[in-house]
Amino acid sequence: MLDIHALEKDTLHDIMLQQLYSFNYIWMRFEIFIAMKAPDEYGSEEYYQLHEDFGAYQARRLARVLGTPGEGIGELTRFLKHSHWAAFEDIEVVDLTADSFTMRTLDCSVQRAAKKWGAQHYDCGKGGLRVRTGFFKGINPGAKVQRVFTPPEVGSEGIPANVSCEWLVSIE
């Protein structure tokens, strides 16, 4: 077992970062594999429930480090800053009201990878909605997530071209 207490902090950081990239890579490979080998299951309710379960699980694990979440929209953004999205992507949060914000991914690494592998885009709409729903509801059961746009759509006029997707997050 990795003796994390014997490692220098920078070494441990680098190891964990490489592990994150490895998990992200295999996630993409599994999605492609399932789409090709199990097309009836790919995109099924059970498939998307796994996405939602992952989001909720991530929120629970973060709560072990960050503490039990309090009330309010600020808790959602606090947890978001420590999520896998923040680890892999440039995330922009735009506060709208006391109970809502938009979450934007800038220059999405997954979209870049999809193009590198020959696809026009990665279809993240349904899965992305379910992961975010599980994550934010795992922090606050009153959270609601709505898709504003995801590829192949582009943002409305005035949205910078480097915004890959946008989500509205609120507490009801």
Over which residues does each language-model region extend?
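Ligand-binding pocket scaffold of soluble enzyme catalytic domains
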Residues: G134
